[in-house]
Amino acid sequence: MLVLLSCAKTMSETSKVKAPLNTVPRFQKEASEIALQMSQFSVDELERLLRVNAKIAVENYKRYQAFHAEATPELPALLAYTGIVFKRLNPKDFSVEDFEYAQEHLRLTSFCYGLLRPLDVIRPYRLEGDVVLPELGNQTMFSYWQSRLTDVFIQDVRQAGGILCNLASDEMKSLFDWKRVEKEVRVVTPEFHVWKNGKLATIVVYTKMSRGEMTRFILKNKAGNPDDLKGFSWEGFEFDESLSDERKFVFTNGKGE
């Protein structure tokens, strides 16, 4: 089983965790070209393009200016991203075996690097899927990557057993020809909902935390079968068979009234 996670907007340049080995991103050349094009934008342009405040725009202007410099810090992707999902995944106590298993059974989406393995070494950046770079065919990052990633992604899923546990956000489907993905491999999408006033509600922060916790559960337990996911429980979230089907695994917190 292969797990797919979304990249995070926040990144770190240092980590106390030491990975057992580093690998080169498979789309390093494309990432370098994208970063080069992004380095042409001014701070004001980045602020508008990335829909961020001035402080974040300045930070990422500096990142892109230094992206190709030899001294620019880099980290394995699993340690570089610092969003809620990755805080909950929490690889601080990962053994060498855990990292090696993750390398084969976890993939991270990236608008800059395309598709990453956990130990692929990356540099800090920020990018959105709807950014259009004229020098790269005047298309969005979603369109740019779709033709490049789909075959590689399907091959990765097949090598991991032919089953995809999709824990990425919905927008990340647009990085791939998702109809082909669903046709050629089995896709299971866990959902996390909270009972509120007798109705199911989706709370973004709980969804992100649960995605990180479930990924940790899968990697630590070497879960290779969708049925293994049904044993996941965290902070009251448990598998709800009555709301689930073969493609959608629903986990709820609490009971309906």
PLM features: residue spans?
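Active-site helix-to-loop segments that bind/position phosphate- or nucleotide-bearing substrates
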Residues: L4-D93
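Internal, well-folded beta-alpha domain core
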Residues: P91-D245, V250-E257
